[in-house]
Amino acid sequence: MADGVLLDTSFLITLADKNRDHHETARRYWQHFVENDITIYLSTIVVSEFSVKQAIPPDILRCCIVLPFNWDDALRAAALDWKRVRPEGVERDALKDDIKIIAQAAIADAAYVVTADERSFYRFCETFKSASEISFKPIQLAAGFDRAAFDVNGQSDFEDMLGEGR
């Protein structure tokens, strides 16, 4: 049974940078994951991308299960039809890491992937999900924090709705 959440690089960057749009939403999701003992997966690909600018804080790392990119992940990435999700004018090289992270989430049987990248990563996930190529639910930070993403009945929390002025 699927469980846990895989963090996309853009989520981690947004969580780390108080000046980025959606930082507060990222912080609330992180707090929700930790307080509710939701398994948090961290891809070595995300580690590689994030570590270009800064080290991952030890308190973040301690909460995560690190996923190395392995044989099964590679085969799943190769099987995903990346040509269908490629935006006009974007070369394959720009998509490779996103496809690998998506494949890792599928192989890890994550229930969710959380991202701040709604323009490409989120869109790729939605396209693959609608084609039944993945089963996890993508969560985008731009939509705001919503506990309903984790509720089997899709029930939002009234306090959360009041806090975000919905």
Residue ranges of model-derived segments:
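A generic "structured core" feature
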Residues: M1-D3, E24-A26, F33-L42, D73, ...
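Short, well-structured N-terminal submotif of metal-dependent ribonuclease cores
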Residues: M1-Y41, V52-L61, A148-R166
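Acidic, PIN/NYN-like endoribonuclease modules and their adjacent C-terminal/linker elements
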Residues: A2, A111-R166
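Short, flexible loop segments at the rims of nucleotide/cofactor-binding pockets, characterized by
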Residues: D17-R20, I45, E88-D93
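Short, surface-exposed acidic-centric catalytic microdomains
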Residues: V46-I60, N70-A74
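Active-site regions of enzymes building and remodeling cell-envelope glycoconjugates
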Residues: D59-P68, E133
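Active-site neighborhoods of divalent-metal-dependent phosphate/nucleic-acid chemistry enzymes
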Residues: P68-R123, F158-G165
